[in-house]
């Protein structure tokens, strides 16, 4: 074996099996391209991406690890999201969530996003 080499079985690998998914339409209302990585909490992506943020809470892009989706200015596209797994805690990013995704009261998270000008928060 070579250091860093992958030895993969010759069979299909199923990712995110059994996790909830969602197709969501996203528009880049900004004047610059925005690239979103595979494991970024989609609710907290760039404030100029407009979509239903409440529906996207606790989800990430359903794409292979290490890849990303790019949204050009004025572009609208539909992406598939998948539930975040693991401990389901989010810290950092745009500093909106900062804690467990499954807490009962999320009103302060949505309020903060709206106050900071994130599009798609009612």
Curated annotation (Swiss-Prot):
<dbReference type="GO" id="GO:0043419">
    <property type="term" value="P:urea catabolic process"/>
</dbReference>
<keyword id="KW-0963">Cytoplasm</keyword>
<dbReference type="Pfam" id="PF00699">
    <property type="entry name" value="Urease_beta"/>
</dbReference>
<dbReference type="InterPro" id="IPR036461">
    <property type="entry name" value="Urease_betasu_sf"/>
</dbReference>
<comment type="subunit">
    <text>Heterotrimer of UreA (gamma), UreB (beta) and UreC (alpha) subunits. Three heterotrimers associate to form the active enzyme.</text>
</comment>
<dbReference type="GO" id="GO:0035550">
    <property type="term" value="C:urease complex"/>
</dbReference>
<protein>
    <recommendedName>
        <fullName>Urease subunit beta</fullName>
        <ecNumber>3.5.1.5</ecNumber>
    </recommendedName>
</protein>
<keyword id="KW-0378">Hydrolase</keyword>
<dbReference type="GO" id="GO:0009039">
    <property type="term" value="F:urease activity"/>
</dbReference>
<dbReference type="InterPro" id="IPR002019">
    <property type="entry name" value="Urease_beta-like"/>
</dbReference>
<comment type="pathway">
    <text>Nitrogen metabolism; urea degradation; CO(2) and NH(3) from urea (urease route): step 1/1.</text>
</comment>
<comment type="similarity">
    <text>Belongs to the urease beta subunit family.</text>
</comment>
<dbReference type="InterPro" id="IPR050069">
    <property type="entry name" value="Urease_subunit"/>
</dbReference>
């Amino acid at each position: 074996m070579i250091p860093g080499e992958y030895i993969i079985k010759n069979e299909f690998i199923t990712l995110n099996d059994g996790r909830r998914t969602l197709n969501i339409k996203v528009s880049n209302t900004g004047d610059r391209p925005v690239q979103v990585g595979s494991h970024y909490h989609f609710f907290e992506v760039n404030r100029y991406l407009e979509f239903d943020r409440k529906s996207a809470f606790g989800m990430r892009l359903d794409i292979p690890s290490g890849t990303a989706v790019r949204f050009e200015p004025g572009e609208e596209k539909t992406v598939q999201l998948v539930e975040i797994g693991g401990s389901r805690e989010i810290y950092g990013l745009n500093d909106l969530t900062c804690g467990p995704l499954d807490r009962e009261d999320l009103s302060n998270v949505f309020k903060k996003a709206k106050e900071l000008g994130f599009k798609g928060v009612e």
